[in-house]
């Protein structure tokens, strides 16, 4: 069995047995895929008690939790985990059955091919990205707080790695070509540019990530594409599904 859900932002209560009772029939060979903004690796320098509790709690679920990165992850820590090969692609194992599916990889799950490409551009940055080491950091932060302008702080609440590198994009295309540009499912955080234009306002504009996913959309044959990021649940045409708090079975 494979289920898909959207952004968690470190709130994993949707996976308790009262809400997600289907897990009683699941084993570690069954999967729940989170479409980015997992948020379980967030504390600045190391895993704190709160994170440990929830990562251990997820590990104790009968299923295996998988996630792609969103734009709200601590990439310094996430990328500090050893890279391992798992089911055909590169991963970071937060726990034995809590696994980060790295960008541009193709995974074999339950006999189906999944192309995964997480990440997105943060849009809650009207006040800019602040440098915590800058001499005027506290002054700028105070001014922005007073004006109620949203901002992010470098290496504390924002990381440039939220956006894929050129190398990751190229690796993704190479991996897809090895499968003749044909997969069963695509998992991402944001979506292709043409898809995004169908349902969002001016808050979200095209960028290098959505343009790359547009290239994937035009080049690759796929059955279904699931993505998060936009905090809603809706079908965008017959093949693309925006998902947030719902947990839906796909296999």
Spans of model-derived segments:
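Beta-strand-turn-beta hairpins that frame and shape the catalytic cleft
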Residues: 1-3, 105-116, 185, 237-241
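Core catalytic region of metal-dependent phosphoesterases/phosphodiesterases
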Residues: 5, 10-109, 200-214, 218, ...
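Short, solvent-exposed loop/turn segments at secondary-structure junctions
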Residues: 9-10, 38-41, 72-74, 119-123, ...
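Short aromatic-enriched loop/helix-cap "lid" or pocket-rim segments at secondary-structure transitions
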Residues: 46, 79-81, 126-129, 198-200, ...
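A broadly tuned preference for mixed-charge, low-complexity surface segments
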Residues: 60-66, 123-129, 230-245
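Active-site-proximal loop/helix segment associated with metal-binding centers of metalloenzymes
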Residues: 96, 110-203
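Internal alpha/beta domain cores that form substrate/cofactor-binding pockets in large enzymes
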Residues: 161-251
């Amino acid at each position: 069995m494979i289920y898909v859900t959207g952004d968690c932002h470190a709130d994993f209560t949707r996976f308790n047995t009262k809400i997600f009772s289907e897990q009683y029939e699941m084993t570690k060979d069954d999967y729940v895929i989170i479409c980015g903004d997992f948020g379980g690796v967030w504390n600045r320098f190391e895993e704190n008690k709160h994170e440990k509790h929830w990562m251990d709690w997820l590990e104790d679920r009968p299923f295996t939790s998988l996630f792609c990165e969103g734009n709200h992850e601590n990439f310094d820590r996430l990328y500090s985990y050893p890279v391992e090969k798992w089911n055909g692609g590169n991963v970071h194992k937060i726990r034995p059955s809590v696994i980060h599916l790295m960008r541009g990889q193709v995974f074999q799950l339950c006999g189906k091919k999944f192309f995964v490409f997480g990440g997105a551009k943060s849009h809650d940055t009207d006040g800019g990205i602040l440098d915590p080491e800058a001499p005027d950091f506290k002054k700028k932060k105070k001014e922005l707080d007073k004006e109620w302008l949203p901002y992010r702080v470098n290496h504390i609440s924002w990381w440039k790695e939220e956006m894929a590198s050129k190398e990751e994009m190229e690796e993704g295309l190479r991996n897809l070509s090895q499968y003749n540009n044909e997969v069963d499912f695509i998992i991402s955080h944001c979506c292709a540019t043409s898809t995004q234009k169908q349902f969002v306002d001016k808050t979200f504009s095209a960028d290098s990530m959505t343009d790359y996913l547009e290239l994937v959309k035009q080049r690759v044959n796929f059955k279904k594409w699931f993505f998060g990021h936009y905090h809603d649940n809706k079908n965008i045409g017959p093949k693309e599904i925006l998902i947030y708090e719902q947990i839906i079975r796909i296999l």
